[in-house]
Design a protein with these regions (language model features):
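Glycine/tyrosine- and acidic-biased, solvent-exposed loop/turn segments at the edges of beta-strands
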Residues: 1-141
């Protein structure tokens, strides 16, 4: 465990290791979180102590499971992937709340559902599709 407020920093818990740089006591740049076997489970990007840009979380085989985009510590976009790397979920955020387009996919890559969020709540017409692409149902919010 490091106690410095500048430079390289490492911290270990029972299950995970955290490693990155500190600047004035705040995380800065790329931080890697690894499990006990040394496998990277997450890679986070910090600027001035806040999450900034793309952070990624990984399946045990190294494939990206989740990608979250941050601006000044707030989520702006969220993508989740199936274990083969196929896109599963896409969400837009504003000020840390779901806001904007939302899309969900079958493991085949075909669109499962789509709609919009406004200030964290579903709004408008949401469409859900069969794997063939035909509309299965519509819900209004």
């Amino acid at each position: 465990i490091a106690v410095s407020t500048r430079g390289d920093y490492a911290y270990r818990t029972e299950q995970l290791d955290y490693a990155g740089k500190l600047s004035n006591g705040d995380p800065e740049g790329i931080w890697k979180i690894t499990d006990r076997q040394g496998q990277v489970v997450a890679q986070l990007l910090y600027r001035e102590g806040k999450l900034q840009g793309e952070s990624r979380f990984f399946y045990p085989d190294g494939v990206v499971a989740v990608q979250v985009t941050y601006d000044n510590g707030k989520i702006t976009a969220y993508k989740e992937f199936f274990s083969d790397g196929t896109l599963k979920t896409e969400l837009e955020y504003n000020r840390g709340l779901r806001h904007g387009e939302a899309r969900f996919y079958y493991s085949t890559g075909h669109l499962f559902g789509e709609g919009k969020y406004k200030k964290g709540r579903r709004t408008g017409t949401w469409k859900y599709y069969k794997v063939t692409g035909e509309i299965e149902k519509k819900l209004k919010f």
